[in-house]
Design a protein with these regions (language model features):
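Beta1/beta-strand and adjacent pyrophosphate-binding region of the FAD-binding site
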Residues: 1-15
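Glycine-rich flavin
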Residues: 2-5, 21-28, 33-143
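Short alpha-helical segment within the catalytic ATP-binding CA
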Residues: 18
Length: 143
């Protein structure tokens, strides 16, 4: 298989995903490398998991207010294990959505690390430690 690309993007967060999709849409052979998971910090440790927790918190708070409105719901309780599971599921769905978006756009995707060797070479190392040198016309660092 030819391992030469028009563009190699290092970083699978929102900026990297957008750049890779745009390049592929313009007919460029594009590869995106991501070390941890598609979607970057926002998806895995920032916006999305935080919003999932806030949604649970708001729902619990709303239940407490219902009593004043004459609505009886019984005693509300928080199951932190279930809340965490909900949060993880939301993150998983978002990451899978990002991966599908890339694949549907025709972007080659790999989980692993990218190391710039020169202006036209990137070393890709997968989770098992196997390394491969890839050639490219352009490199975009999107951390």
């Amino acid at each position: 298989m030819d391992e030469t690309y028009d563009l190699i993007v290092i970083g699978g967060g929102p900026a990297g995903i957008s750049a890779a999709r745009l390049a592929a849409a313009k007919g460029k052979r594009t590869l995106i490398l991501e070390k941890e998971g598609w979607g970057g910090t926002c998806t895995h440790r920032g916006c999305i998991p935080t919003k999932a927790l806030l949604t649970c918190s708001k729902s619990y708070s709303d239940l407490k207010k219902f009593k004043r409105l004459g609505i009886r719901t019984g005693e509300a309780a928080i199951d932190f294990g279930a809340v965490k599971k909900h949060q993880q599921q939301i993150v998983r769905v978002a990451a899978l959505g990002a991966e599908k978006t890339l694949a549907d756009a025709g972007v080659d995707i790999r989980i692993g690390e990218g190391e710039i060797l020169s202006a036209s070479e990137v070393r890709y190392t997968d989770a098992g430690g196997a390394a491969q040198t890839l050639k490219t016309s352009h490199i975009l660092i999107a951390w």
